[in-house]
Each structure stands twice: as structure tokens, then as C-alpha cells.
Amino acid sequence: SDVYKRQILANTILTYSDLITNRKTDYKFDLEKFSNISGKTGIYVQYALVRAKTLFHKSELKLKKEFYTTKLDEKDLSLIHSLMKFEIYFEQSLNNSEPHHLADYLYELSNLYNSMYQSDNILENNDKEITNNKLLITSYFIDYSILLMESLGISPVDKM
């Protein structure tokens, strides 16, 4: 329901804004800043995830679980490289009891995904290998975003 979705998004704003900040520094909570759809906010990372889920569900391509490496562009490679850093950020956050590392990482992934998404009309591309690459990256982004959100105590949404 809409009420439930609003509650989840409100929780996202509060939780993410609290966890994005290093505990060793002071910060002032600013509702307007932390509820903005752009920037390091919970709404921004939720929006990136919803965008990815929507794209993935609209696709009619039968996804092959392999990359066509000659068809990866710079934005694809940046996101793939960042996705491969998951264990580093997770261990750093866990070992130091500093959840802001995971929150920062979630923002980094969301930002890179949005950059890839905006650079190419993925579903309109006539090259099925490029489309497959981008959808495969999208599927990994979705999986990692959900895992990161749940690790931070944030419930992912399907629609906004």
C-alpha cells in the first residue's frame, strides 16, 4: 500500500542519513538534504534500485550469464570493477564497526549505475550483446544493492 511504501521511504531517509555519516564526526540532521532525490541520500539509492528493477522487468531479452567482453564500455567496466569491491567494503565496515563504509559503497554503486543507465538507451539498443551486458550488470547491481540495503537495515522498494 502507499502508506506502507511511505513508511519504508521515511525509514530509508532516517536510517541512511544516520549511517552515511562517520560516527567519529558530528553532523547536523537536515531533512531537506537527506530526503533529496539526488546526492548521498537514501532516496537516491532507492531510486537507482527501482530504476534498475524496472528496466530489468521490462526487458524481453533472454539473459545470458556471460559478458561479451569486447562489447563492454568504460561505464560498464567502472561499475563491474566497483561491484567486485563488495567484500573489501563489507569487511572494512564489519571489522571497524563503521557502517558508513557500506552506505558510501551503496551510493557509489548507485551513482555508477545511474551513469551507465543514462548513457545508453539499453532496451532500444540493436546490438543484443551490448544489451545483454548491460542487463547482466543491472542484475548484479540489483542483487548487491538489495544485500547492502538489508545489511544497513533498509527495506528495498519495488516502486516509488
Where does each model-flagged region fall?
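Non-catalytic interaction-recognition regions
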Residues: S1, K5-M160
